[in-house]
Amino acid sequence: MLPGRHTPRRADAAAAAAAMEPLVPGATRAALSEFVATAVFVFAAEGSVYGLWKMYRDTGTLGGLLVVAVAHALALAAAVAVSRNASGGHVNPAVTFGVLVGRRISFARAALYWAAQLLGAVLAVLLLRLASGGMRPMGFTLGHRIHERHALLLEVVMTFGLVYTVYATAVDRRSGGGDIAPLAIGLVAGANILAGGPFDGAAMNPARAFGPALVGWNWRHHWVYWLGPLIGAGMAGALYEFVMAEQPEPPAAADTRLPVAAEDY
């Protein structure tokens, strides 16, 4: 028998198994974890903006920026902490995309995560609108004299930093178990909001922008909050995975087995 004779058959079997992955109970539980964690994060994050507007009719002050940054940092840290064991604690389609670029997750599972994250964000904003007596969500908008190209660059840079932090503290096996990951991820998100909030709101998360946009039906500049984070996340995932991460030693003998699906971290 020639080596590799049945490789196409194995490849077909692996592809079929990967396509069925969303139906596996573990994948379903992971997606549910992402749904709940994203809803928790977006409810607290967007809720902090609701609260400021309810009390002061203004969210553009230094104090307001600090409140929103702290709320996002704490909510994201908590959301990552409660979901990391079940799903890896992505809570963000951009993070999932960065992990996909690094080949740490299969496309089938990534698609399942994206759907769960977007639905969780929409549910959170719907609940906020109901609980607030019909207040429209604030959502994201560009600051005075800020062009879309400026906001796009900001989102690329800020999301790059966020996803790079995810890789360094949660994905990399050298991080010592990733116990610091939720705090580090929350802190970098809060710091980025302090830096970029006055310019474009500092979303760094397509789901965070999508929920308010859908519920409030305001799509102006919305593409910026998808394209920027996805570019930044892809760059961070590629850089860390293929340059910064410790590469495994080559096996003594070639292993022709094909995995069913990429392992999530």
Curated annotation (Swiss-Prot):
Highest taxon, organism lineage: Eukaryota
Pfam families recorded: MIP (PF00230)
GO molecular function terms attached to this record: water channel activity
Motif NPA 2: where in chain: 205-207
Tissue: Expressed in leaves and at lower levels in roots.
SUPFAM superfamilies in the record: Aquaporin-like
Keywords, in A-Z order: Membrane, Repeat, Transmembrane, Transmembrane helix, Transport, Vacuole
Domain statement: Aquaporins contain two tandem repeats each containing three membrane-spanning domains and a pore-forming loop with the signature motif Asn-Pro-Ala (NPA).
Protein name: Probable aquaporin TIP3-2
Organism: Oryza sativa subsp. japonica (Rice)
